[in-house]
């Protein structure tokens, strides 16, 4: 239980790391619930951050979990996600947690498309500003090299460092500080998505970063 999180409403939105049972929509959601928060989680696989400002059909499915309710997974053809303004009106969050980095990393490309990433991030952070909620932005974890998405430790580091520069007013959570490169096991041949044990460790690390950050001190209870 966290005295600072207890009773707060947390809205979590993210990419593929929030779209499958056993991923962060399971582990981090559970950790924040144990801290006494009301948690509403939504994942949209394969979508950049700016896509949360409109209703979209995620290319590889979506998922949602409403506080104590069950985790619901939807294939891409099942319909559209709810945009952030609608989610804010529905849940009235005190804190918005954004988990989006790998999807925009373009790890197979020679370099990060910085202007595109900046535009995507700004589109979402502008929406978060308008909501009046506090915000944290969770950057990518190390993963492993040699997977099908082209992720390498150097590219994960470059993406994390760039996101940290551009996600204001959100407080940046650097996932790379939570483990050593390759420490958390990924799905064989994947390199980007973790095994259950990896998501347990990542969820715990994010939860610790949230409850020990200054941002909770600024939220009125």
What role is predicted for each listed range?
Residues 10-13, 17-111:
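Conserved SGNH/GDSL esterase-like catalytic core that processes O-acyl groups on lipids
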Residues 84-88, 121-125, 160:
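Generic structural signal for well-ordered alpha-helices
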Residues 1-9:
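Hydrophobic alpha-helical targeting segments used for export or membrane insertion
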Residues 141-221:
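Catalytic His-Asp segment of secreted/periplasmic serine-dependent ester chemistry enzymes
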Residues 112-122, 153-159:
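Charged helix-capping and loop-helix junction motifs
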Residues 97-106, 124-157:
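Active-site segments of SGNH/GDSL-like serine hydrolases
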Residues 18, 22, 29-34, 89-92, ...:
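Sec-exported extracytoplasmic/periplasmic mature domains
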